[in-house]
Amino acid sequence: MFSFLILVFVASVADSVIGTAEVMSHVTAHFGKTLEECREESGLSVDILDEFKHFWSDDFDVVHRELGCAIICMSNKFSLMDDDVRMHHVNMDEYIKGFPNGQVLAEKMVKLIHNCEKQFDTETDDCTRVVKVAACFKKDSRKEGIAPEVAMIEAVIEKY
């Protein structure tokens, strides 16, 4: 009986991780749709734009300042940042909850981003700070097991 309970617990934890990674794939696909609109405004090269499609892959390094500028532009399209170019917690929470099963990810994602923002709060250049926050968020999402596989994003991208 005890081993059955452990099996049920492990299965529910695995389901939860898969569920949050699946929600993250929806968030990423939808958010990423605005990248082309923001490319010129942010000075993002076509090469980096193409690479961004693989944001969650191990091979993609989140280091380019222009990517931070693009993320700011993209976030502003959905009102996800305050005037001080920091995350708008309520809007981000609601944005994530707007996706299928988003409530399983919203609180964790807001917390991870906020913790990353605190680490780089002294960075005065908004684009540089945001790209550092994005890199931190990617690393922490992987650590938490909520980062989606690129194939998951590709599977849902047509919905947006």
From Swiss-Prot:
Keyword Transport: yes
UniProt organism field: Bombyx mori
Cystine connections: 38-73, 69-127, 116-136
Name the record gives this protein: General odorant-binding protein 2
N-terminal signal peptide: 1-20
Pfam families recorded: PBP_GOBP
InterPro entries given in the database record: Odorant/phero-bd_Lep, PBP/GOBP, PBP_GOBP_sf
Tissue: Detected in antenna (at protein level). Expressed at high levels in antenna.
SUPFAM superfamilies from the UniProt entry: Insect pheromone/odorant-binding proteins (SSF47565)
A GO term for molecular function: odorant binding
Subunit: Homodimer.
Function: Present in the aqueous fluid surrounding olfactory sensory dendrites and are thought to aid in the capture and transport of hydrophobic odorants into and through this fluid.
Record's keyword terms, sorted: Disulfide bond, Olfaction, Sensory transduction, Signal, Transport
Coiled-coil region list: none
Record-level GO BP terms: sensory perception of smell
Domain of life: Eukaryota
Similarity field: Belongs to the PBP/GOBP family.
